[in-house]
Design a protein with these regions (language model features):
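Active-site beta3 strand of CheY-like receiver
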Residues: 55-61
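Acidic catalytic/metal-coordinating carboxylates
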Residues: 43-47, 70-73
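Non-catalytic signal-transmission and effector/linker regions of two-component phosphorelay proteins
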Residues: 1-14, 125-155
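Receiver (REC) domain active-site loop signature in two-component systems and cognate sites
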Residues: 66
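Charged docking surfaces used in two-component/phosphorelay signaling
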Residues: 26-34
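Short amphipathic alpha-helix used as the core "switch/output" element in two-component signaling
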Residues: 50, 72-84, 104
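Active-site residues of response regulator receiver
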Residues: 63, 91
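Alpha4 helix (beta4-alpha4-beta5 surface) of REC/receiver domains from two-component response regulators
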Residues: 73, 94-116, 129
Length: 155
Protein backbone atom coordinates (compact mmCIF):
# COMPACT_ATOMS: atom_id res chain seq x y z
CA UNK A 1 0.00 0.00 0.00
CA UNK A 2 1.71 3.18 -1.19
CA UNK A 3 1.11 6.82 -0.56
CA UNK A 4 -1.90 8.09 -2.53
CA UNK A 5 -0.87 10.29 -5.46
CA UNK A 6 -2.73 13.29 -4.00
CA UNK A 7 -0.76 12.97 -0.76
CA UNK A 8 2.68 12.91 -2.39
CA UNK A 9 2.81 16.71 -2.64
CA UNK A 10 1.75 17.28 0.98
CA UNK A 11 3.95 17.79 3.96
CA UNK A 12 3.30 14.65 5.97
CA UNK A 13 1.23 15.34 9.03
CA UNK A 14 1.38 14.69 12.74
CA UNK A 15 -2.02 13.19 13.59
CA UNK A 16 -3.71 12.49 16.93
CA UNK A 17 -6.25 9.65 16.99
CA UNK A 18 -8.62 9.57 19.99
CA UNK A 19 -10.82 6.46 20.18
CA UNK A 20 -11.68 4.09 23.02
CA UNK A 21 -11.56 1.06 20.68
CA UNK A 22 -7.98 -0.26 20.57
CA UNK A 23 -8.65 -2.09 17.29
CA UNK A 24 -9.75 1.16 15.65
CA UNK A 25 -6.70 2.97 17.04
CA UNK A 26 -4.42 0.27 15.62
CA UNK A 27 -6.12 0.22 12.22
CA UNK A 28 -6.09 3.99 11.81
CA UNK A 29 -2.49 4.19 13.02
CA UNK A 30 -1.37 1.49 10.57
CA UNK A 31 -3.11 3.11 7.60
CA UNK A 32 -1.81 6.58 8.38
CA UNK A 33 1.74 5.44 9.15
CA UNK A 34 1.85 3.45 5.90
CA UNK A 35 0.90 6.70 4.16
CA UNK A 36 3.89 8.35 5.87
CA UNK A 37 2.18 10.28 8.65
CA UNK A 38 3.26 10.43 12.29
CA UNK A 39 0.49 9.12 14.57
CA UNK A 40 -0.15 9.36 18.31
CA UNK A 41 -3.14 7.58 19.88
CA UNK A 42 -5.24 8.10 22.99
CA UNK A 43 -7.97 5.86 24.43
CA UNK A 44 -10.23 8.56 25.85
CA UNK A 45 -11.07 12.23 25.63
CA UNK A 46 -9.12 13.29 28.71
CA UNK A 47 -5.91 11.64 27.50
CA UNK A 48 -6.46 13.07 24.02
CA UNK A 49 -6.94 16.55 25.44
CA UNK A 50 -3.76 16.19 27.49
CA UNK A 51 -1.78 15.08 24.43
CA UNK A 52 -3.32 17.85 22.36
CA UNK A 53 -2.06 20.37 24.89
CA UNK A 54 1.51 19.07 24.75
CA UNK A 55 1.84 18.18 21.07
CA UNK A 56 1.77 20.10 17.84
CA UNK A 57 -0.76 18.16 15.77
CA UNK A 58 -1.90 18.94 12.25
CA UNK A 59 -5.10 16.87 12.42
CA UNK A 60 -7.31 15.21 15.02
CA UNK A 61 -9.36 12.04 14.52
CA UNK A 62 -11.97 11.96 17.27
CA UNK A 63 -14.49 9.28 18.19
CA UNK A 64 -17.81 10.82 19.22
CA UNK A 65 -18.98 8.17 21.68
CA UNK A 66 -16.45 7.31 24.38
CA UNK A 67 -16.85 6.65 28.10
CA UNK A 68 -15.98 9.50 30.43
CA UNK A 69 -15.32 12.58 28.31
CA UNK A 70 -17.10 12.04 24.99
CA UNK A 71 -16.00 13.42 21.65
CA UNK A 72 -18.30 16.44 21.83
CA UNK A 73 -16.86 17.63 25.15
CA UNK A 74 -13.33 16.84 23.98
CA UNK A 75 -13.93 18.86 20.81
CA UNK A 76 -15.23 21.84 22.80
CA UNK A 77 -12.08 21.85 24.92
CA UNK A 78 -9.72 21.29 21.97
CA UNK A 79 -11.33 24.25 20.20
CA UNK A 80 -10.42 26.47 23.18
CA UNK A 81 -6.73 25.52 22.83
CA UNK A 82 -6.53 25.00 19.06
CA UNK A 83 -9.35 26.83 17.29
CA UNK A 84 -8.00 26.08 13.81
CA UNK A 85 -7.02 22.39 14.11
CA UNK A 86 -8.89 20.25 11.55
CA UNK A 87 -11.01 17.59 13.28
CA UNK A 88 -12.41 14.47 11.62
CA UNK A 89 -15.08 12.76 13.71
CA UNK A 90 -15.44 8.98 13.60
CA UNK A 91 -18.19 6.86 15.08
CA UNK A 92 -19.61 3.36 15.05
CA UNK A 93 -23.12 4.77 15.47
CA UNK A 94 -24.92 6.41 12.57
CA UNK A 95 -23.51 9.93 12.33
CA UNK A 96 -26.23 11.46 10.16
CA UNK A 97 -29.86 10.87 10.99
CA UNK A 98 -32.38 9.76 8.43
CA UNK A 99 -34.75 12.57 7.46
CA UNK A 100 -37.26 13.16 10.23
CA UNK A 101 -35.24 11.38 12.92
CA UNK A 102 -33.00 12.70 15.65
CA UNK A 103 -30.32 13.25 16.76
CA UNK A 104 -28.05 14.25 13.92
CA UNK A 105 -24.58 13.82 15.42
CA UNK A 106 -22.85 15.16 12.31
CA UNK A 107 -24.69 18.48 12.60
CA UNK A 108 -23.78 18.65 16.28
CA UNK A 109 -20.12 17.85 15.54
CA UNK A 110 -20.00 20.36 12.67
CA UNK A 111 -21.32 23.11 14.94
CA UNK A 112 -18.43 22.32 17.31
CA UNK A 113 -15.89 22.54 14.51
CA UNK A 114 -15.57 19.11 12.87
CA UNK A 115 -14.64 19.46 9.22
CA UNK A 116 -15.21 15.88 8.07
CA UNK A 117 -16.64 12.57 9.30
CA UNK A 118 -16.25 8.83 8.85
CA UNK A 119 -18.61 6.12 9.97
CA UNK A 120 -17.10 2.87 11.27
CA UNK A 121 -16.43 0.55 9.67
CA UNK A 122 -14.82 2.73 7.03
CA UNK A 123 -12.83 1.79 3.96
CA UNK A 124 -9.09 2.54 4.06
CA UNK A 125 -9.44 4.61 0.89
CA UNK A 126 -12.12 6.77 2.55
CA UNK A 127 -9.92 7.40 5.58
CA UNK A 128 -6.94 8.37 3.45
CA UNK A 129 -9.11 10.56 1.20
CA UNK A 130 -10.50 12.39 4.26
CA UNK A 131 -6.99 13.01 5.58
CA UNK A 132 -5.70 14.16 2.20
CA UNK A 133 -8.71 16.44 1.71
CA UNK A 134 -8.32 18.02 5.14
CA UNK A 135 -4.59 18.56 4.80
CA UNK A 136 -4.94 20.02 1.30
CA UNK A 137 -7.74 22.35 2.45
CA UNK A 138 -5.71 23.47 5.46
CA UNK A 139 -2.67 24.03 3.25
CA UNK A 140 -4.69 26.15 0.81
CA UNK A 141 -6.17 28.16 3.70
CA UNK A 142 -2.76 28.90 5.21
CA UNK A 143 -0.48 31.54 3.73
CA UNK A 144 2.51 29.86 5.41
CA UNK A 145 1.51 26.41 4.06
CA UNK A 146 1.40 24.88 7.53
CA UNK A 147 -1.59 22.48 7.82
CA UNK A 148 -2.41 23.51 11.39
CA UNK A 149 -2.56 27.24 10.59
CA UNK A 150 -5.97 27.22 8.93
CA UNK A 151 -9.11 25.16 8.76
CA UNK A 152 -11.23 24.74 5.68
CA UNK A 153 -14.02 22.32 4.96
CA UNK A 154 -12.57 19.08 3.65
CA UNK A 155 -15.63 16.87 3.20
Amino acid sequence: MGIPAAAENLTLARILVVDDDVAVQSTVRLLLERAGHSVVTAGDGRKGLSLCGTGDFDLLFLDIFMPGMDGFETMRMVRQQHPLMPIIVISGRPISAEPGTAPDFLTMATKLGAVSSLQKPFRPADLLAAVTGCLEAAKRASPSSQPSDGVASCR
